[in-house]
Swiss-Prot record:
GO terms for molecular function: DNA binding; mRNA binding. Signal peptide: none annotated. One of its GO terms (biological process) is stress granule assembly. The lineage of its organism: Eukaryota, Amoebozoa, Evosea, Eumycetozoa, Dictyostelia. Residues 21-140 form the DSCP-N domain. Residues 161-178 have a biased composition (Low complexity). It comes from Dictyostelium discoideum. Keywords: Glycoprotein, Phosphoprotein, Repeat, Sporulation. It comes from the Eukaryota. This is Spore coat protein SP96. SMART domains: FOLN. Glycosylated; may contain fucose and GlcNAc-alpha-1-P-Ser. The gene is cotA.
Amino acid sequence: MRVLLVLVACLTYFSGGALAQSCSSYSGDNCPSTCFQGSYDIPCGAQVKYCTEMKDNCGEGGDVKCWKDGSNLPVQTWSSCVPSELFGPNGKFKPSEIPNSSNCPTNCENGVEWVNLCGLSCDAKTACCPDVCQCKGGQTSGGSTTGSQTSGGSTSGGSTTGSQTSGGSTTGSQTSGSQTSGGSCSNTQCPNGFYCQVQGNNAVCVPQQSSTSGGHQNDPCDTVQCPYGYSCESRDGFEAKCTRDEDEPTHRPTHRPKPPHDSDKYLCDNVHCPRGYKCNAKNGVAKCIAGYEIPRVCRNIQCPTGYRCEDHNRNPICVLEERENPDNCLTCNDVNCEASGLVCVMTRARCKVGAAKCCDVQPTCIKPSTIAGSTIASIASTIASTGSTGATSPCSVAQCPTGYVCVAQNNVAVCLPRPTTTTGSTSDSSALGSTSESSASGSSAVSSSASGSSAASSSPSSSAASSSPSSSAASSSPSSSAASSSPSSSASSSSSPSSSASSSSAPSSSASSSSAPSSSASSSSASSSSASSAATTAATTIATTAATTTATTTATTATTTATTTATTTAATIATTTAATTTATTTATTATTTATTTATS
C-alpha cells in the first residue's frame, strides 16, 4: 500500500512539473495574462516581442538600456523584466553603455554635420544608435571636437562616425552623411530635420529650427520609442529616459518627428502614436501623451485600429473610439415594411470590430405579433416620427397577421390586435374612460352628449328607453359614457336622424303610436334596448382594444375607428327595428279598422 502511495505521489509530482509551463516558453504574441509581455527594439524600426515572468516592478523603472550581440548591433530595452535566456549573464545580449549625444562643436572650419553612430541611414533609430554632431570633414580650428575626436591633423574627405583620429589617420567606418563638392548644395543630401546651406563656399547641413550651425543640441528623445505608459524625457540633453506618465499614457511615436520652420502645430503630422495615446507638440518636441488610462486587463490586448480596450467586469473588450456615420445611413423611409404587414423600428446596429465606418442605428422590420400592445403604439409613433410613407391607402397593401387588424394612422398602416366581443368589464371600461378623458376630442364631446341626452329624454320613447334595464345598464357603464363622449357616438344615441325620425317624428308612427300606446312603448323599448345593446357591445369592443395599448395616439385612433363602426351599426339596427315596429303597428291598426268596418 505504501509503495502504491509513493508511486501516485511521484506521478503527481512529475506530471505537475511537466504541465507547469514557464513564461519564457511562450512566444511574444501568445503571452498569457499571468506573464509579462515586453519587447526590445532593433535599430531601423524592428521590434521583437518576448514573454517572461511577471514581477512587481515590471516597467516601473523604465530606464533605457543598451545591449549588444555578437554582430555588435545594439538593441534597446526599457523594462527591468527581461528574459534571462536573452539578457542574462549567459544570454545572447551583453550590456552596453548608452552613447553620449553631445552638443555640436562651435570651432568647426567647414561647419557641422550629423551622422549616425552605427552607420544607419533609416529614420527609426534608437537611443543606442543616435545621430551625433561633428565637424564637417573632421577639420577644427583648434581644440578637440565632441562626437568625432581628433588629435592633430584632419580627416581626408568623407565623414567619420564617432571615431577617433590620431595623426591624420582615421579609425572607424565612413557613413553616407552630407558630402560636399565644390560648396554646392545641388549634390548634397542632408539628414531628416536639416537643410543644406552654403557657408563660406561650403555646403553645410544645418538644423531646420536654427539658421546657424552653433549651439544646436540634438534631443535624445527624437530617436527613442518609449512603450505605452511611458514618455521620453531627456536629462541634461545627454540621456533619454522613459518615465511613467501620471495618466498612464499608452502611445509612443513610431517615426521621428520632423521639426517645422515656424510652428509646433505641424510637428505631429508625421507622428503615429499607438492606441490610447495622442501626440502633443510643445517647444519643438513631439511627444505621445496619455489619451486615457489603460486597465490592467488590457495590458496585453492589441485592439484593431480605431478601437481601444476597456475593462468590462474584468474582461477586456475592444470598443470603437470614434465611430464615423456614413452619409448613406438607412432610415424607415428607405424600407417598406408595411407592404409586408410588418412595422419598422430603428434598432442599434452591431458594428463589426475593425469597421472604419458604421451606422449607429438601422431600420428593422418586425412582426407586430411579437410585440406587446403598449409597444405597438410606440412603434406607430416611431414610424410617424421617421416619416415613413406607404401607398395611397396604407391598409390596402398591408397584410396583418392572424388576429390583427390594419388601422391607418398618419398615412401609416399599423397592425393592432383584433378586438374580441365580450361583456364590458370595469377595468377595461375604466381604461377606456381615462383614455377618452385625456383626449381633447373626447372632452369636447361630453357637453354635446349631455345636451343630446336631455333632448332625447323629452320624448316618450326616449323616456321609456331610459327606464329599460338594458338602457340603464348602458348609461351607467363607464364604457358607455366613454363611447357617448365621442361625437359620432353622441349622434347615434341622441341626435341620429334615422333613429329620431323613426321613433318620434314620423307622421305615420305618431298616428299609430297614439292609437296603441302600449305597442308603441314596447316597440320603442325594444328599439332602445337593441340600440343600447349595440352601444354596449361597441363600447366593450373599444375598451378591449384600448386596454391593449397605453399610447394616447393609438388609443384615440382605435376608439374613433371602433366608435364609428358601432355608431353605424347602432343606427342601422335602430332604423330597422323602428321601421319594422311601425309597419307592424300600421298593419294591426288597418286590420282592426277593416274588421270593425266589416262588422258594422
